[in-house]
Amino acid sequence: MRIPKENLTHGFIAEILDLFQVNSMTSDNNLVLVRGNYHSTIHLNKDEDFIEFISTLEVKDFGKIYLSFLEFIMKSHNRDFDIDFDDYPNKNGCNDLTFLFKYDLRNKSHIEDIEILNLHNLFESLLYKANHMCREIVLIKRENLINHKEEKLIKDINKLERIYRK
């Protein structure tokens, strides 16, 4: 179904996603809340003419080098996928990674209902990849930490051996 861009609303986006069995609803502040594999929101910005998909993930000890790597990987999948890192830790010591995907409506007079579903599915697949990469980064960090501890343990054992051999 072709929907004129000027008739597109948050409520209409939620209804379209519901028709395709995507659990969504509108909130009081004109966002569409989506509860699928990942919790996300959809924001229709009529002033700047885009649809924005947003989701947040909490990370701990996620340095700038990891963020740079994640951004590089995700941009290679889709150049419209952005990541925002909140420098200020939450109460639990974690930082927020916000994943953003903007779809430009400026050159469109209509949008198809299936296109909205496809955009949602694309965002979910990008979230899956980003989440997977974050898990990989955490596993690599833990493995490096364990290896470092093992190296230190081996050095300490070697020192003890030398002491006892004297």
What are these regions (language model features)?
Residues 23-28, 45-47, 87-96:
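Short, ordered beta-strand-loop transition motifs
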Residues 136-166:
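Short, highly charged C-terminal tails/helix-capping segments
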Residues 36-40, 49, 79:
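Short acidic/polar mixed-charge low-complexity motifs
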Residues 28-35, 53, 97-101:
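Generic recognition of long tandem-repeat/solenoid scaffolds
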Residues 90-124, 128, 132-145:
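Well-ordered alpha/beta subsegment
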Residues 55-104:
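Short, internal acidic amphipathic alpha-helical interface segments
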Residues 1-44:
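Charge-rich, low-complexity N-terminal segments
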Residues 42-59:
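A short acidic-to-branched-hydrophobic micro-motif
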